[in-house]
């Protein structure tokens, strides 16, 4: 029995990046031997065990043979005769197919993953890459993480991804897995690389057709020097990742705030009147299809519907601003206003030449919300008001607080 550290922990150590969970592969053992040493079996589709002390996952070396369509259609062989090289061959990318001997620290790199790390190239291990459609998503997600480190996608890997998209292999992706990879990509430093990688492979139209439809739609060059709405969206996503690192909630709202521009009649281009209202329907459809969690849906719909109002905050009447806060449920969910401000700032700065622009509307929105939030129903009830009187007085007092905060700049 030999034990090796594999996958992301080895890769990240070589990149001198923070490592996440450690994964181990065991060569030359079977389930009975693992259990005899105290390992607890937990795998359903293939033999995976938890270490009796560390709780880390240890998997028996295995091969996988394609037996059907999609990412579940595999026959697994975890016989003790399976070699380390055979186990590494089934992995997706060369940089993830490096193993380190637990005892000696020696690296095993049969597919030149170290060379690709040094060259900053994301490359598939072998032809079996095309057998699992999830690997297209993983390639895009890894690019979102690694592009800031200078990585590019190998041309032959990009070609395989295009073949998979053209062949309909991506149709078998389940919504939960698409959402899982999208959410992780939105937590990375450069989400635009996720979008661009999928778009270039003609896979975005299958995975996120509502976002793919933005590419090629022109905007007014005086407001958007980048012109193409798809490019604008890439820039917004990257700015959002800078403003709120690792925050997929803000990232998803930023990603979907402009979906309505894809529905603007071509005769109206490059203007997009009412796009903030048109965008709600495709956003809801996307959320239903991918089974997006409610907190993500709600913030995204708010950002889609309200971002233009926040941009023109100074023009809004006090009562109109209060109505915006109510639509955001900002008195019960006050955190939404800071999140909305981040999305709107990303939208404003996600334009060529505006990447470092100031966005005073964000701080103003938070300040005015805080003033209104300081007024509460308990204080009014203490004054003897009851029932509907409290609601009416609360609205009036909050609007007055917004007006006072505007006048004093407090």
Swiss-Prot record:
According to the entry, every stretch annotated as the HD domain falls at: 229-347
- Write the Enzyme Commission number(s) for this entry: 2.7.7.72, 3.1.3.-, 3.1.4.-
Q: Which reaction does it catalyse?
A: a tRNA precursor + 2 CTP + ATP = a tRNA with a 3' CCA end + 3 diphosphate; a tRNA with a 3' CCA end + 2 CTP + ATP = a tRNA with a 3' CCACCA end + 3 diphosphate
Q: Which GO terms describe its molecular function?
A: ATP binding; CCA tRNA nucleotidyltransferase activity; cyclic-nucleotide phosphodiesterase activity; magnesium ion binding; phosphatase activity; tRNA binding
Q: Which residues bind CTP?
A: 8, 11, 91, 138, 141
Q: Which UniProt keywords apply?
A: ATP-binding, Hydrolase, Magnesium, Metal-binding, Multifunctional enzyme, Nickel, Nucleotide-binding, Nucleotidyltransferase, RNA repair, RNA-binding, Transferase, tRNA processing
User: Which InterPro entries does the entry link to?
Assistant: CCA_bact (IPR012006), HD_domain (IPR006674), NT_sf (IPR043519), PolA_pol_head_dom (IPR002646), PolyA_RNA-bd (IPR032828), tRNA_CCA-adding_enzyme (IPR050124)
Give me any GO biological process, just one: tRNA 3'-terminal CCA addition
User: For this protein, what does the record note about how its cofactor is bound?
Assistant: Magnesium is required for nucleotidyltransferase activity.
Q: How does it assemble?
A: Monomer. Can also form homodimers and oligomers.
* Family membership noted in the UniProt record: Belongs to the tRNA nucleotidyltransferase/poly(A) polymerase family. Bacterial CCA-adding enzyme type 1 subfamily.
The UniProt record's further free-text remark is: A single active site specifically recognizes both ATP and CTP and is responsible for their addition.
**Free-text comment on this protein's domains from its UniProt entry:** Comprises two domains: an N-terminal domain containing the nucleotidyltransferase activity and a C-terminal HD domain associated with both phosphodiesterase and phosphatase activities.
What is the recorded function of this protein according to its Swiss-Prot or TrEMBL entry? Catalyzes the addition and repair of the essential 3'-terminal CCA sequence in tRNAs without using a nucleic acid template. Adds these three nucleotides in the order of C, C, and A to the tRNA nucleotide-73, using CTP and ATP as substrates and producing inorganic pyrophosphate. tRNA 3'-terminal CCA addition is required both for tRNA processing and repair. Also involved in tRNA surveillance by mediating tandem CCA addition to generate a CCACCA at the 3' terminus of unstable tRNAs. While stable tRNAs receive only 3'-terminal CCA, unstable tRNAs are marked with CCACCA and rapidly degraded.
Q: Write the protein's name.
A: Multifunctional CCA protein
Q: Which organism is it from?
A: Xanthomonas axonopodis pv. citri (strain 306)
């Amino acid at each position: 029995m030999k034990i090796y550290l594999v996958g992301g922990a080895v890769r990240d150590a070589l990149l001198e990046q923070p490592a996440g969970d450690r994964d181990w592969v065991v060569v030359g053992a079977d389930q009975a031997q693992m259990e005899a040493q105290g390992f607890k079996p937990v795998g359903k589709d293939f033999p995976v065990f938890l270490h009796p002390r560390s709780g880390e996952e240890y998997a028996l070396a295995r091969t996988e043979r394609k037996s059907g369509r999609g990412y579940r259609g595999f026959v697994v062989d975890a016989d003790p005769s399976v070699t380390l090289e055979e186990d590494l061959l089934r992995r997706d990318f060369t940089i993830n197919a490096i193993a380190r001997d637990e005892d000696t620290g020696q690296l095993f790199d049969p597919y030149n993953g170290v060379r690709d790390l040094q060259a900053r190239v994301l490359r598939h291990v072998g032809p079996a890459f095309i057998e699992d459609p999830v690997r297209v998503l993983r390639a895009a997600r890894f690019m979102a993480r690694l592009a800031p480190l200078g990585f590019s996608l190998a041309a032959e890997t990009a070609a395989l991804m295009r073949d998979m998209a053209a062949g309909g292999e991506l149709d078998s992706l389940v919504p939960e897995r698409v959402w899982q990879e999208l959410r992780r990509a939105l937590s990375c430093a450069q989400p635009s690389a996720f979008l661009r990688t999928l778009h270039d492979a003609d896979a975005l139209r299958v995975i996120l057709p509502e976002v793919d439809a933005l590419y090629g739609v022109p905007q007014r060059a005086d407001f958007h020097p980048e012109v193409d709405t798809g490019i604008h969206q890439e820039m917004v996503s990257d700015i959002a990742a800078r403003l709120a690192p690792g925050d997929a909630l803000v990232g998803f709202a930023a990603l979907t705030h402009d979906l309505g521009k894809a529905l603007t009649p071509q005769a109206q281009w490059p203007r997009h009147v009412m796009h903030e209202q048109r965008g709600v329907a495709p956003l809801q459809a996307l959320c239903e299809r991918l089974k997006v969690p409610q907190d993500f849906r709600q913030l995204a719909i708010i950002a889609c519907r309200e971002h233009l109002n926040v941009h023109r905050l100074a023009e809004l009447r006090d009562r109109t601003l209060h109505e915006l806060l109510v639509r955001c449920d900002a008195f019960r969910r006050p955190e939404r206003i800071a999140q909305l401000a981040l999305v709107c700032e990303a939208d404003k700065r996600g334009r060529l030449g505006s990447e470092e622009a100031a966005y005073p509307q964000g701080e103003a929105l938070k300040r005015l919300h805080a003033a209104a939030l300081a007024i509460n129903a308990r204080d009014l009830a203490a004054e003897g008001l009851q029932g509907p009187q409290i609601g009416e007085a609360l609205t009036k007092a909050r609007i007055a607080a917004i007006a006072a905060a505007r006048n004093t700049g407090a």
